[in-house]
Design a protein with these regions (language model features):
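Metal- and O2-centered redox machinery and metal/ROS homeostasis
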Residues: 1-164
């Protein structure tokens, strides 16, 4: 797929962060929240070509706002760079240039105008589903930033696990 850049592969980084936050037995400890389950259900339900909207929301979000979240978490939680591997894109030295490359690949996808509109709608819905996860995590935990970081890891791991 034209937007399946190797630089975006996150599973090893995700596993490293999960081990940092939950320990070696993390696979038996964490489970998806209701909002995460709804997100995964949506991803499984839609036509594969509309996953582009989720891909765009996830990765451009991680390369933009995710970098801000990473820096805030690192400073406010004194993480010294640990537990943040998910937000490290070692193969992307210049996120701005990469995002331009990604957008060019999107612009060149062989899709119809109407599919493009549906992909945009799905990207907006993916953003809403992400916000549902944040709302659920924030309302149930005393440390919102840590809960958000951990919740993103749970969401992502839940989505990866559901594809296997």
């Amino acid at each position: 797929a034209p937007i399946a850049f190797d630089e975006l592969k996150r599973v090893p980084a995700l596993e490293k962060d999960c081990e940092f936050y939950w320990g070696e037995n993390w696979r038996n400890i964490i489970s998806p929240t209701d909002a995460c389950k709804n997100y995964v259900k949506r991803v499984k339900k839609i036509n594969a070509k509309f996953l582009v909207g989720h891909h765009y929301t996830r990765y451009l979000g991680d390369l933009s706002g995710g970098q801000i979240l990473k820096n805030i978490a690192n400073k406010s939680m004194n993480l010294n760079g640990e537990g943040l591997a998910f937000y490290e894109f070692e193969g992307i030295p210049n996120p701005g240039n990469f995002k331009n490359r990604y957008r060019t690949a999107l612009d060149n996808l062989p899709i119809t105008w109407s599919d493009g509109e549906l992909i945009i709608n799905e990207a907006n819905y993916a953003f809403k589903l992400n916000m549902d996860v944040f709302d659920e995590i924030g309302s149930s935990r005393p440390f919102p930033l840590l809960a958000t970081m951990r919740g993103l890891l749970q969401l992502t791991w839940g989505a990866i696990r559901s594809k296997k």
